[in-house]
Amino acid sequence: MLAIGITGSYASGKTFMLDYLTEKGYKTFCADRCIKELYQDVVLQTQILKLLPELESFNIRKISNLIYNNDLAREKLQNFIYPLLIDKLILFKKENANSKFGFAEIPLLYEAKFEKYFDFVVTIYCSEAIRMQRAITRSSFDIEIYNKIKEIQLSQESKIAKADFAINSGVDMLDLEKQIAKLIKDLECRV
């Protein structure tokens, strides 16, 4: 199986692309969904509360506010959660070893140094104006967190430069689907 990582800036279209690939029958993995599932574990919640005593209770919103405003807390949580995420990613790859492709959406792929787990990386991108427009429509949108995320992430340009492939999601649906189809064709040549 070729393992393909999908990354990009906040609200760049990563989840849309992953959902599209899932709909087309490809094997997919979403880091954000995986972490949300991990957070359902009461034992893990207790461990995080011990790790981050600033939190009075396990609350995703409070965790977000803390980690985007406290570098040490973010580093502690990442050092705790990333190995668990890597285990789940490795399991996904093993379970789908007979598939031609496996696509994994990892928002902080480069920042977390996860590129070593992939044969190829795709960066999905669009303009800042489009990202902001998409972000505002989310029920969880918080302008301060949006700006903090932008601060800690590599720039979109850096992600594009590091990637094997880049997809512009700031286009109409037909053009986006054509770009994804071209990506699949390019990957087919590398199997």
UniProtKB/Swiss-Prot annotation:
Record's catalysed reaction(s): 3'-dephospho-CoA + ATP = ADP + CoA + H(+)
Disulphide bond pairs: none
Pathway: Cofactor biosynthesis; coenzyme A biosynthesis; CoA from (R)-pantothenate: step 5/5
PROSITE patterns linked to this entry: DPCK
Residues at which ATP binds: A11, S12, G13, K14, T15, F16
Presence of the UniProt keyword Kinase in the record: yes
Gene of this entry: coaE
Domain called DPCK: residue spans: 3-191
BP GO annotations: coenzyme A biosynthetic process
One example GO MF annotation: dephospho-CoA kinase activity
EC number: 2.7.1.24
Family the entry assigns: Belongs to the CoaE family.
Main location class: cytoplasm
Keyword Nucleotide-binding applies: yes
Stated name of the protein: Dephospho-CoA kinase
